[in-house]
């Protein structure tokens, strides 16, 4: 199993969620995060003053899937989240040793 973590623009969440649900993904976790990369923040105006926001609002979408679903999930996220502009985000994939459903004790694929 793998965990797919995608850092995306907040306004792209609905498109990403719909694409994943339509592909059969039944669960995901979404967290509000802040960060910067090549985009390095942005200048904003507030009450006539300019200031630089260094850490930009993003969302982190986390999904645990079987190894054979990873490429499909990544493709769906990219297609739904891409604007073509700097700041579209990143996708990280990491191994998951074990998943346990607390309520039933089910493990691994049955727990996802």
From Swiss-Prot:
UniProt-listed SUPFAM superfamilies: GlnB-like
Keywords: Nucleotide-binding, Phosphoprotein, Transcription, Transcription regulation
Post-translational modifications: Phosphorylation dependent on the nitrogen source and spectral light quality.
GO cellular component: cytosol
Reported function: P-II indirectly controls the transcription of the GS gene (glnA). P-II prevents NR-II-catalyzed conversion of NR-I to NR-I-phosphate, the transcriptional activator of glnA. When P-II is phosphorylated, these events are reversed. In nitrogen-limiting conditions, when the ratio of Gln to 2-ketoglutarate decreases, P-II is phosphorylated which allows the deadenylation of glutamine synthetase (GS), thus activating the enzyme.
Subunit-structure text: Homotrimer.
Name recorded for this polypeptide: Nitrogen regulatory protein P-II
Species the sequence originates in: Nostoc punctiforme (strain ATCC 29133 / PCC 73102)
């Amino acid at each position: 199993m793998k965990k797919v973590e995608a850092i995306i623009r907040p306004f792209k969440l609905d498109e990403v969620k719909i694409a994943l649900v339509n592909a059969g993904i039944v669960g995901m976790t979404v967290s509000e995060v802040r960060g910067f990369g090549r985009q390095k923040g942005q200048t904003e105006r507030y009450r006539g003053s300019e200031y630089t926001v260094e850490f930009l609002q993003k969302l982190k979408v986390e999904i645990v899937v079987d190894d054979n679903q990873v490429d499909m999930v990544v493709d769906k996220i990219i297609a739904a989240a891409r604007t073509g502009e700097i700041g579209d985000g990143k996708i990280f994939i990491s191994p998951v040793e074990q998943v346990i459903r607390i309520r039933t004790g089910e493990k691994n694929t049955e727990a996802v």
